[in-house]
Amino acid sequence: MVLYGLWLYKYAYMTFLRHVVMLSRRRNFGRYLESRWGNCAFGTIQASVALLVLLLSLVHPWRAFAANPDLETVLTASRQRIEKLDYRSTGRLTRVEGNGKRTSYKFVGKARWFSDGLRVLCEITGPGSEKTSLLVHMSVSGHVTIEAVLPGEKAASVLPFERWNDPLAGTDFSFEDMIESQFFWKNQELLAPEKYGTRDCFVLKSKSDSQDRTYYDSVTSWLDHGILFPVHVLKTLRGTGQQKEFIYYGLRQVGGAWSATQVEAKLQGKPGSSILVIEGGSGNANLGSKDFDISQFGAQGEMK
């Protein structure tokens, strides 16, 4: 497509030059024709310029069209929401089997956006006191790294990418699901608006590329039109095409920021679901970098 566009560009340019040369050689124009020369030449230039703009759009389409204002609004709001995070939270993470059996874990988490990006630190404690701690860091450009202290381990280590999609404490949430990196991917598309339940929603499709460290090929988010907060998210895994659904309940505004009190995760083809319930915390925790020492966090067992 690029080579074809360049060929057309060259063809249009040469055609334009031929028009100018032919007109300049016609010395036997009458006064009437001479008086029309300016208009004719100007019209030729206009047509050629218009054609060149069209052809350049084939080579650089993103320069030919203004940015979608709704897309810009949705992306800006989503990124700013994440860039303003500064919270502590406590609650429980529950796996509900297809037969109704429940297994609950204590959940403690905190997050803060710093000058170098977002840090999320959380700990999940099971019924037998086994603990999983993880520290997720996302840079300002969206690059993600994960450290973890898994059950039976005494020290934190970098979690290999191959394990990012592992179930977190046996639930439908994965390690990667603890962060919303999709809003920082380069490939973003705003689909036709839809209703989700009673809510009018923007529908944003975020697609990953080879530079994005993620197990997801795409993430589609339904964001409430009025508050620009996700109410439904559908993640599609690379390779398999398997989908994971996230539903947000109990939306509330605390200190000017919107959040959900519950998030339910359902994996396609797997009975049951998992529910993260936030029971307490602070939306303006004034956290510092020292609050994200995963070794100290695991040793404390509670958040200060």
Where are the language model's segments positioned?
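Bacterial N-terminal signal peptides that target proteins for export
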Residues: 25-49
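Gly/Pro-enriched, hydrophobic low-complexity segments
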Residues: 125, 145, 157, 166, ...
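Bacterial N-terminal signal peptides
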Residues: 46-59
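Flexible, processing/modification-adjacent segments and terminal tails
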Residues: 67-76, 80-86, 101, 130, ...
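A short, Trp-centered hydrophobic/proline-enriched beta-strand micro-motif
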Residues: 83-96, 120
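Compositionally biased low-complexity segments enriched in histidine and/or tyrosine
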Residues: 4-13
